[in-house]
UniProtKB/Swiss-Prot annotation:
Protein name (database record): Cytidylate kinase
Family that this chain belongs to: Belongs to the cytidylate kinase family. Type 1 subfamily.
Reactions this protein catalyses: CMP + ATP = CDP + ADP; dCMP + ATP = dCDP + ADP
GO cellular component, one term: cytosol
GO terms of molecular function: ATP binding; CMP kinase activity; dCMP kinase activity
Entries under HAMAP family matching the protein: Cytidyl_kinase_type1
Entry keyword annotation includes ATP-binding: yes
Residues annotated as binding ATP: 11-19
GO biological process: nucleobase-containing small molecule interconversion; pyrimidine nucleotide metabolic process
Organism: Bacillus anthracis
SUPFAM superfamilies registered for this protein in UniProt: P-loop containing nucleoside triphosphate hydrolases (SSF52540)
Keywords for the protein's UniProt record, in alphabetical order: ATP-binding, Cytoplasm, Kinase, Nucleotide-binding, Transferase
Signal peptide: none
Domain of life: Bacteria
Gene: cmk
């Protein structure tokens, strides 16, 4: 498997993208790039600095002074903000419920996309997000669009929150996920949408292993060409 391709995995909030992308990257010995974590890190930094996240100019001041780095931990990927490990704090509900607001700003997205493309320029990457196949890596050899029902995604996020010790309300999560879908799909810059050449994968009734197997089958098909 010497071929170093780019794999783009898109889909709505809590569709299981990052969980699956990490496993696929590990199987291929590829670099996993969690673009959602990049936007979460900006959101966290802005909240810490008490910046108005609706104000693009103020947000860009935050972005300019933020260095985001990824490091492979033992069983997970660690995210660093200016040298500080923020892997856990960027997953709190406070950040989760505001990240779509930060991500809707055109200048913020342009800068993040530039950084993401830089990370991916040599290939051998698995990148997940909302606009990877359509905007960040439009020439990716493999493009997957993962879907799951709002109910299923809320259940997954609820379990995730409980496991991390966060307060969690299932009905509230359903509302929040539906709201994030709306924000992500309706924003003017790089909205959430399936690339024309992406393969759609409904994961509602599939396990992580089954989704990974399906994606690996697609990747091996590309290698065989």
């Amino acid at each position: 498997m010497d071929k170093r391709i780019s794999i783009a995995i898109d889909g709505p909030a809590a569709a299981g993208k990052s969980t699956v992308a990490k496993v696929v990257a590990k199987k291929l010995s590829y670099v996993y790039i969690d673009t959602g974590a990049m936007y979460r890190t900006i959101t966290y930094a802005a909240l810490e600095q008490k910046v108005d996240i609706e104000n693009e100019e103020q947000l860009m001041e935050v972005v300019k002074n933020v260095k985001i780095e990824f490091q492979q931990g033992e069983n997970t990927q660690l995210v660093f903000l200016n040298g500080q490990d923020v892997s856990e704090v960027i997953r709190t509900p406070e950040v989760t419920n505001r990240v779509s607001i930060v991500a809707k700003h055109r200048l913020v997205r342009e800068e993040m996309v530039r950084r993401q493309q830089e990370l991916a320029e040599k290939g051998g990457v698995v990148m997940d997000g909302r606009d990877i196949g359509t905007h960040v890596l439009p020439d990716a050899e493999v493009k997957i669009f993962m879907l799951a029902s709002v109910e299923e995604r809320a259940e997954r996020r609820h379990l995730e929150n409980m496991n991390k010790g966060f307060d969690s309300n299932l009905e509230q999560l359903k509302e929040e996920i539906a709201q994030r879908d709306k924000l992500d799909s309706e924003r003017e810059v790089s909205p959430l949408k399936k690339a024309d050449d992406a393969l759609e994968l409904d994961t509602t009734s599939l396990s992580i292993e089954e989704v990974v197997q399906k994606i690996m089958g697609i990747v091996l098909g590309v290698f065989a060409k």
